[in-house]
Amino acid sequence: MTQSNPLIPALLTDKVAIVTGASRGLGAQIAEQIAAAGARVCVNYLSSEDAADQVVADIIAAGGQAFAYQADVSDLAQMQALAAEVVARYGRIDILVNNALPSYQFNPSADYTSIETVKWAHFSQQLDGIVKGAVNSVQAVLPQMKTQKMGKIINISTNLVYNPVVTYYDYTTAKSALIGLTRNLAAELGQYGIRVNLLAGGLLQTTDASRLTTEEVFDYIATTTPLRQATSVADFANSVLLMASDLSLAITGQSIAVDGGLTMP
């Protein structure tokens, strides 16, 4: 269940957004808050159809517009079909949020937290879902954004790339690659009015992926963060809303930590 925020301003009226991996957790929260700000939203999902339909139902019940679309971000043709459907329904694509993440558990005792036990298969799965997924999604929406001469692309990463409090080798390596991707995209696509930024979240309290995280880890985050609390899913989604809006038109190519000041890169 997402966290409600009745105070979201109408920053995205008449905008059209795609949020990948939006059937639950952070993606669902982002989709709902973007919709609450006035955007029409495509809720992308891989396999959780019922959950995606519920996100859409929640958006519509709150007075927004949305539809769910099944597509694997690691398949370019599927993402191109998704983009075509969005344009057919809504006429444009203004915002892409690259949030999709392969199935993952933030378990500090897992074998992918040590260089001695992590396997290349762990890296491959994360690189395929995170980096390839983001590249495919950008390539799918790019023709429409170039035609419009505007667009916002927001890549979702983690503050673990700056401060590996827990050494999730596979996940952090893939998320680190998004920084380079973000900068290259911003450098090339700025001439078309397309802004590309990255938001690096802390360990969010709480999502499906972080449910195995111990209270000791959350307590450590709270005591070492200037704001003395872990970042909530709703707070992170509000940062996405800011970057998706016209309030951030002068910002591109940036990697911004959204973690209450825990990391200051």
Go through each PLM region and give its residues.
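Short C-terminal tail/terminal secondary-structure segment
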Residues: T2-I8, N163, T223, L227, ...
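Catalytic Tyr-X3-Lys loop
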Residues: E116-V135, M150, I154, L178
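Conserved glycine-rich cofactor-binding loop
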Residues: V16, S23-R24
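Conserved glycine-rich Rossmann-like NAD(P)H-binding loop of the short-chain dehydrogenase/reductase
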Residues: A39-Q54
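Conserved mid-core segment of classical short-chain dehydrogenase/reductases
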Residues: Q80, P102-S124, T167-D170, S210-T213
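Short, small/polar-rich loop/turn modules that mediate ligand/substrate recognition or access, typified
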Residues: G190, R195, I251-G253
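Alpha-helical segment proximal to the catalytic Tyr-Lys
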Residues: P143, A187-E188, L249
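Active-site helix of classical SDR
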Residues: V138, A174, T182
